[in-house]
Amino acid sequence: MKRILGLIVLFLMPVLSTAANIERQVNAWLAQMTMEEKIELLGGTKGFFIKGVPRLGIPEVKMSDGPLGIRANGKSTAFPAGIALAATWNKHLAFEEGNAIGQECREKNIGFILAPAMNIYRAAMDGRNFEYFGEDPCLTGQTAANYVQGVQKNKVVATVKHFVANNQEYDRHWVSSNVDERALREIYLAGFKTAIQQGGALAVMSAYNPLNGIHCSENKTLLTKILKKQWGFTGLVMSDWGAVHSTAAINAGLDLEMPRARYMNKENIIPLLKAGKVDTATIDDKVRRILRVCLTMDLFNPNREKPAVDWDAHHQVALNIAREGIVLLKNEDDLLPLSAPAIKTIAILGPNAEDTPSSGGGSAHVKPYRFVNFVDAITKRAGTNFKVTFINTNRYPSFARLIRQTRVFSDPQLKTPGYTAVFFNNTRLTFPPVARRVDPSINFDFGALAPAFGVRSQNYSIRWRGFFKPSKSGKYVFAAESDDGVRVYVNGELVLDNWSDHAPEKRFAEKALKKGKVYRLRIDYYNSHGGGMIRFGFAPLDETPLSTKLAALKNYDAAIVCVGFNAQVEGEGHDRPFALPKEQNELVQKVSAINKHTIVLLTAGGGIDFSPWIDEVQAVLHTFYLGQAGGTPVAEILFGDVNPSGKLPFSVPKRWQDAPAYGHYYPEGEAGPIYKSNHKDHPVGVNYDESILTGYRHYDQLKIEPQFPFGFGLSYTQFEYSDLQLSPRQIEKDGTVTVRCKVKNIGSRAGAEAVQLYIHAETRVPTPPKELKDFDKVYLKPGEEKTLTFTLTPEKLQIYNIQNHEWEVKAGKYEVLIGASSRDIRLKKRFLVTP
């Protein structure tokens, strides 16, 4: 019978194309399922799977992180950070990224992508800002909606996350985000609403944090009242991994507990059903949502077509996003683009020059199938027209250089290059080994795959042995980056010890060696769970004083300093400082004092404290994290092949004290939190006292000059705005206004301009001085002019009424403001909404 039912399911898959057919199949399955089978569906399995119902032929369905590409199943296209996508202000590129990720999911048999990530950028220090789309709900919502449509075009489920107000990583499981009702509706929920109602997202992931004292996964107001009833969401709600803390989630509206059912299991639910504390209809609704979504996207069909992925085309999408997302923040005296003969010799230096990070850390990190760092990309693009020199200002060389310089042999006679590698199916390096081979280098990102044939994909260990002979006497640096544990021995002496479970971490050790002596080398490594990776290398320690290295900069026409954060500093599970490390700020200051043509390349997921050096350098590019595009688009912009068109999706304060979250996030910009929780026994909260005055709304309301305003970004050309037209100029509350304006490229280069439409409501209800309501990006040749059209619907004019808990359009005057940024308004005109 089981086989017959399974064959029936397979037969039905191709014809379940209408909502009515899908509901009929869901009802048929519900009628056949036992309560135990229904409950089994409510918890995940194997880390990233929805369970199946084998008796009915319903298969498991696979999920994967994350927003910047597919984290599972080896290498995939690694797209630029979400914040870089938002900085493009390009809805089409958001769709193209989603479409590419959806295609790759199909190729890898993944049914759910845990993306997009779309929490509001509240403070620069949030470790996951790099994944998100900035500080404004309109920009966030439109970017997310187009991303979702791209993903789901491929019959892959997009999962919008993290619902809601997950705006800090510090103690994210227990610190309550305490948000007033108007701010919650107008700022923090608004983007999700757009992604669901306009984008059609079929899955929502509840956040780790409590909202107003109640964990999001157990918050009935959030999941049932707002999401499912008021918004009409018919998809499924899953928890973030380990985000459920009690059986309250059952009646709150959570449908799927991930990665497994700790609370939504039969041991808990069946007694609650018998006691009348949970209704059968509640369980049926959860199962119905899971089955409906999977059937809608054809995820139960074993014969789903796997498209042939055009990896080069997807790389081009990633490259285009990076090109349009990089923001030119400063370009004094038009130093950029670099051109001969004014600039012929260029020095590149800084911690991120060679060790260029592709992404922040955590579940959003993707293993790219190609990558080029800043130094190599700039050097390649410069060709023979420029002389480019890398100057290492770090104590230790980059990992890329260390690996290239390392020379190891598998025999003491130094005849056979490489390491002898032995693999074990345990984490203790205990015999017997299950595989052996010779590796030319130790530079592996195994991910979730097995490191060798016959070896497990988790809970394994590797021992590499080799021999080497130093080329000179002196101190050498030994470096290892690993996930999880690593130990390095030289002639039996333990010189580097990082033997524990951890995310990717870099460790360095120094040891004096003698020229001409043959040394024995041993590297032990284990991976207990999750993705495995290890890189190792060694080289002579360059002890040339930094002052000597920097003095040479006076001989170069320009100096490019690569500073910022990386996956270890900025990522999931922790927050990062507002300021760059002291040594990086000092490096920029020293370089700019020696070379007047100093250019800063900043790698970060948001704003920083620019004050230590912004007035001393000539040019600044905010590159965010560029994924596998790496240094290529940066080089293209530096030399003028690409005209920068990115604009900031967040505001940057001149100092942390000016920020809207100051006083209820971190004190004085230091790394230490102002709150401490003892978890569930003494939960604490962060009060969002700025309410609706987030980001640029705060700076406008309090008349504070930011370092760089929301929507700001320079170009190598200039744009002129004109002829603002509103039609009609008077409407009723349910009316619509059409807005038109002209934009002309009055410069000498082709370029693109992100045109921003803001509204100021001159009503009795207090509103911010301006709020973004729409945007568009226009591409113009020199001298070319185009007309842009926007539509202001009632939804874009609504304000949330906290007295009657409803959305309303208020009567009064409304001012339309068309700008190049939130502080560069070019055109204004009013219209009237009558009572």
Spell out what each predicted region is.
Residues 802-803:
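Flexible, membrane-facing loop/turn or short amphipathic-helix motifs
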Residues 18-476, 481-484, 489-493, 501-799, ...:
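Glycoside hydrolase catalytic-domain context in secreted enzymes
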Residues 1-21:
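Bacterial Sec-dependent N-terminal signal peptides
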Residues 824-835:
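Short beta-strand elements
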